[in-house]
């Protein structure tokens, strides 16, 4: 078995729930995708149907059913998919894929991310250098931290099995699987991996690999869902 099997793309995400399926299928681990998001968006955007998408500014493609509030700021390259909502004062810094029916809310900032379909980051969230799976949801004020305080390259660690993989990347946020729920005002530290269907309690500081189908109450109190 390869290292950190639970961290593989195939075990975190339903790839049928993202326009980035073709990109993700090329890699084993999700953090390997991060350096390639920009190029993929530009290549994909040029192929999108002009009957369905409008290029509202250079390298920013928005589906005609998406709702963009007037005070939202969107830089490219970015793709915003069908029925997505970008609310007031949202700040999309580019290199962002916002999936179908996704919500990017008030004062939420995105940078170098893939949001699968039906993701919600609705209130005061920061999501950078991260991938959020189908129906993942962040409570108000929850953020991904994408750079270590010592500025060293991020290492993915499972503190239970002591397995680890060097990403060789300085900026890695969080990789959250499908149906992950992150409670209000939580911090997902650099290189955090949260398995499918896992809930994170509010006010948590999370690091390392959190297994699927669990409830994270604190770093020393993680229980299986019943």
Label every PLM stretch briefly.
Residues 62-64, 68-107:
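Glycine-rich active-site/cofactor-binding loop and its immediate structural neighborhood
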Residues 1-59, 64, 197, 203, ...:
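Terminal amphipathic alpha-helical/low-complexity segments used for targeting or macromolecular assembly
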Residues 20-22, 115-117, 122-226:
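Glycine-rich hexapeptide-repeat left-handed beta-helix
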């Amino acid at each position: 078995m390869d290292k950190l099997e639970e961290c593989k793309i195939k075990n975190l995400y339903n790839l049928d729930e993202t326009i980035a399926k073709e990109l993700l299928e090329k890699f084993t681990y999700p953090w390997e995708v991060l350096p390639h998001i920009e190029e993929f968006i530009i290549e994909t955007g040029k192929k999108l149907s002009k009957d369905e998408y409008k290029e509202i500014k250079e390298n920013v493609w928005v589906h005609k059913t998406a709702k963009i509030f007037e005070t939202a700021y969107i830089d490219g390259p970015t793709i915003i998919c069908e029925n997505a909502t970008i609310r007031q004062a949202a700040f999309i810094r580019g290199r962002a894929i916002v999936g179908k029916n996704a919500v990017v809310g008030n004062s939420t900032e995105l940078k170098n991310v893939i949001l699968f379909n039906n993701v919600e980051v609705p209130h005061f969230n920061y999501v950078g250098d991260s991938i959020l799976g189908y129906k993942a949801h962040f409570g108000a004020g929850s953020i991904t931290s994408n750079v270590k305080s010592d500025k060293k390259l991020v290492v993915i660690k499972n503190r239970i099995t002591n397995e680890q993989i060097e990403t060789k990347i300085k900026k890695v946020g969080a990789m959250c699987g499908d149906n992950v729920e992150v409670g209000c005002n939580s911090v997902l530290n650099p290189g955090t991996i949260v398995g499918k269907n896992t809930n994170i309690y509010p006010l948590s500081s999370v690091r390392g690999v959190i297994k699927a189908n669990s409830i994270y109450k604190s770093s020393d109190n993680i229980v299986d869902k019943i």
